[in-house]
Amino acid sequence: MTGNGNSTLIINAGSSSVKFRLYLNSAIAVDGVVDAIGKNARLSFVKNKVYQEMQGVRVQARNYTEAANEIINVLENFVALKKIKSVVYRVVHGGLYSEPQRITPSVLKELEKFAPLAPLHQPQSMTLIRFFMQQLKARHIACFDTMFHAKMPALANTYAIPRALAQKYKIMRYGFHGLSHASLLRAAEQYAGKKYQKVITCQLGNGISLCAIRNGKSVDTTMGFTPLEGLPMGTRSGSIDPAIIPFLCKHEKKTPRQVLSLLEHESGLKALSGFSDIRDLLAGEKRGDARCKFALDFFAYHIRKQIGAYVAALNGLDCLILGGGISRAPKMRQRILSGLETLGIVLNQKVLSHESPVCISKGKVAIWIVETDEQGYMYEITKGLREV
């Protein structure tokens, strides 16, 4: 056991993983993840930023409760559990909450209502919250992917459907990936040593979203009422003509739920090429697979088109920020950002292949490649709630 100071645990649930980070007296004591939850779960962690032998060890984590037990087992090597004073969770859907919230029974009940709108993440977060609330006598705090977008202008968050229905069911563009977009902005401005007024952030992982930011505030984003809206993603269709859904229900004899599952799990890049991972697509293109090439071109085209739309919405652009696994691939940086020179987005080929953090521009618009750090951002913005 390395220390007994007051500690904060950060929990970040994904669709098949749980990231965790333990802060001990404001320093990172351990950073880890249980991924591939199910039959082939693995536990990896870094102690004080030094990789340990336990990188990628197989663990018994068939579900999120068992994954949480594995996390507890790791934590006990670093801190007495009673010294963990705060637990901070990433929750994908927070409705209209615009700030982190102490988790009370009423807050938890409210968050559970949003599970159908974020089925890949919300139920997992609820399972983890209930588990750790039983295990740890600490302050439990929720941070929401939606809260960065909670004050978007009505022009951006309104759907053109009957107002009575929108109000009755709270149907609006909530936006997601907010913790990622906010952390990307924070990182780029820290590296640049300056603030940017007009910014577009691009979260490029298996889930894809862009955000238009003016003076540090989200003013538009691609995801909407659910994380299914927006750009094409690894397995998600992104925005499509809504009439396609009843059409498929009728002609394929499917229920709306079945069609929704198809759009969430069997669409996007996977539908176009057979692969959802950009690395597999790049390898396929190299082998001469025409479907992989088309999927990559399709993907880059739609991102470029959205960047152009947000430049118009912002009336200019000072900084473009890319983060997430796809942003680490120089070939994807080139593919996505080529052809935007008329917008002032010009690549510096000399540093295009450099690892993040790096500014890869030689035009008037700064282009930053930085790492997303949701856990660090969550720790920072919950300071007031943690220290009450």
Predicted regions and their residues:
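Short glycine-rich, Thr/Ser-proximal phosphate-binding strand/loop in the N-terminal lobe
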Residues: S16-A61
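Glycine-rich phosphate-binding loops at beta-strand->alpha-helix junctions
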Residues: D318-L340
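Glycine-rich phosphate-binding/hydrolytic loop that grips phosphoryl groups
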Residues: S327, E341, N348-V388
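Phosphate/ATP-binding catalytic cores across multiple sugar-kinase/actin-like superfamilies
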Residues: L184-A187, Y191, F294-N315
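A mobile "lid/hinge" subdomain adjacent to the ATP/sugar-phosphate binding pocket shared
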Residues: H251-A295
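Glycine-rich phosphate-binding loop of actin/hexokinase-like ATP-binding domains
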Residues: K151-L248
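Short beta-strand-loop/turn "lid" adjacent to the catalytic site in phosphate-handling enzymes
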Residues: I72-H121, R139-I141, M147-A156
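Extreme N-terminal starter segment of soluble prokaryotic enzymes
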Residues: G3-L9
